[in-house]
Amino acid sequence: MKALLTLGLLLLSVTAQAKVYNRCELARILKRNGMDGYRGVKLADWVCLAQHESNYNTRATNYNRGDRSTDYGIFQINSRYWCNDGKTPRSKNACGINCSALLQDDITAAIQCAKRVVRDPQGIRAWVAWRTQCQNRDLSQYIRNCGV
């Protein structure tokens, strides 16, 4: 009985853990989902963005005390504008999704919402981390030896 309880707790802890992609795995998934060149944004920019926003972690969250919003998932998509978490005052939910969808190991919803973000006038500049860590830099290291 004790062994079954231990096994159950172990399985529960494994399912609660986030998927943390490596850069090449992420680059291949993003390329397969049409992100390379989407709205003029190169694949290396997306990988750089994900590294600096979430360290490639699908379950990353960051609460912003100032406007009481939260950033969700591998791209740290904000609940004030892009998704609904049921907690953020005056949320716009421009992606039309629940924020929990951005925390899945399957990042399809996060990719679709990121595409929606870059269709806005700010484009990829909507992400502070991209402006401070990726913009105007040589990003070739982010996709080097990835076969993409």
Swiss-Prot record:
Subcellular location: Secreted
UniProt keyword list: Antimicrobial, Bacteriolytic enzyme, Disulfide bond, Glycosidase, Hydrolase, Secreted, Signal
One MF term in the entry's GO annotations: lysozyme activity
Known EC number: 3.2.1.17
This protein's record includes keyword Nucleotidyltransferase: no
Active-site residues, as the UniProt record annotates them: 53, 71
Secreted among keywords: yes
EC class: hydrolase
Chain ranges of the C-type lysozyme domain: 19-148
Biological role stated in the UniProt entry: Lysozymes have primarily a bacteriolytic function; those in tissues and body fluids are associated with the monocyte-macrophage system and enhance the activity of immunoagents. Lyz1 is active against a range of Gram-positive and Gram-negative bacteria. Less effective than Lyz2 in killing Gram-negative bacteria. Lyz1 and Lyz2 are equally effective in killing Gram-positive bacteria.
Additional free-text comment from the UniProt record: Lysozyme C is capable of both hydrolysis and transglycosylation; it also shows a slight esterase activity. It acts rapidly on both peptide-substituted and unsubstituted peptidoglycan, and slowly on chitin oligosaccharides.
PANTHER family found in the cross-reference section: LYSOZYME C
Protein's recorded name: Lysozyme C-1
Organism this protein belongs to: Mus musculus (Mouse)
